[in-house]
């Protein structure tokens, strides 16, 4: 029994052209769906175009089902551009980026996650980013988790109820070789709906640092993300799972010796997703 003959290069190129045309047609079809979505939202009185929970779910599903020779980095980047651009079409906005610790890593991250259609505004400091988001109609801000010692307790500016809040932690699919793997927070004006609340971010003020804090918080599933001196003691930025009650966080800190504990929620985001064990070529 002889093997079936391989297709010619001409036939393969025709198939590739047909696939490309289909992909373009599907993108245009997606655009028509977005047109309808915009019209429905107008009739219903509007609503935020940002859906952090949905975006996180979409990116994880894409990463989990991906197979073949096309790198996951490429697939993730394409979908981030698609999602972010169509969000921009629904609600034009800019992304404010803190480049105080270096322009290249933050710009790479901004362009990977938000594409090139969404305007990117650089600021030399966290305060500029927070102010830009507060003063913009639909703007987003992007801040490195490690904003540097000069940033101080920057998260305290997010404490007022109407101040911008953390809505996402990027990248959605974490892995050691991620092309835009710098851990960043995305901030926006408080969302009425569509927010992810797997991890709650708390601004904590207390008397001083104690070495027992990290272990005490780890025992309840919480984590210290940042710490800085404050005018009346110490300021911490803490992430706690939504299943961990605020009272449990307070009790853990008090049990570790803390005094004068005060807390304010400054945002929330989807649960982190470890993509290091994915096998896209399997």
Predicted regions and their residues:
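Domain-level signature for soluble enzymes in the chorismate/prephenate branch of the shikimate pathway
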Residues: 1-282
């Amino acid at each position: 029994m002889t093997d079936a003959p391989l297709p010619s290069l001409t036939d393969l190129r025709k198939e590739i052209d047909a696939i490309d045309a289909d992909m373009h047609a599907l993108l245009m079809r997606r655009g028509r769906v977005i047109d309808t979505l915009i019209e429905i939202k107008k009739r219903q009185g509007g609503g935020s175009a940002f859906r952090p929970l949905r975006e996180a779910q979409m990116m994880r599903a894409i990463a989990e089902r991906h197979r073949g020779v096309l790198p996951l980095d490429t697939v993730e980047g394409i979908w981030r551009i698609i999602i972010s651009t169509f969000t921009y079409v629904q609600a034009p906005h800019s992304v404010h980026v803190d480049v105080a610790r270096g322009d290249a890593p933050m710009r790479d991250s901004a362009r990977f996650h938000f594409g090139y259609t969404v305007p990117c505004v650089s600021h030399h400091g966290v305060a500029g980013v927070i102010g830009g988001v507060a003063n913009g109609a639909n703007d987003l801000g992007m801040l490195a988790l490690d904003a540097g010692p000069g940033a101080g307790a920057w998260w305290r500016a997010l404490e007022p109820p109407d101040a911008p809040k953390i809505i996402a932690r990027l990248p959605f699919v974490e892995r050691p070789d991620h092309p835009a793997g710098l851990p960043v927070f995305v901030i926006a004006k408080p969302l009425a709906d569509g927010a992810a609340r797997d991890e709650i971010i708390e601004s904590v003020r207390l008397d001083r640092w104690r070495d027992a804090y990290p272990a005490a918080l780890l025992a309840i599933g919480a984590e210290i993300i940042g710490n800085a001196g404050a005018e009346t003691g110490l300021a911490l930025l803490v992430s706690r799972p939504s299943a961990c009650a605020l009272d449990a966080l307070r009790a853990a800190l008090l049990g570790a010796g803390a005094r004068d504990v005060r807390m304010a929620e400054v945002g929330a985001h989807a649960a982190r997703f470890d993509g290091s064990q994915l096998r896209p070529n399997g």
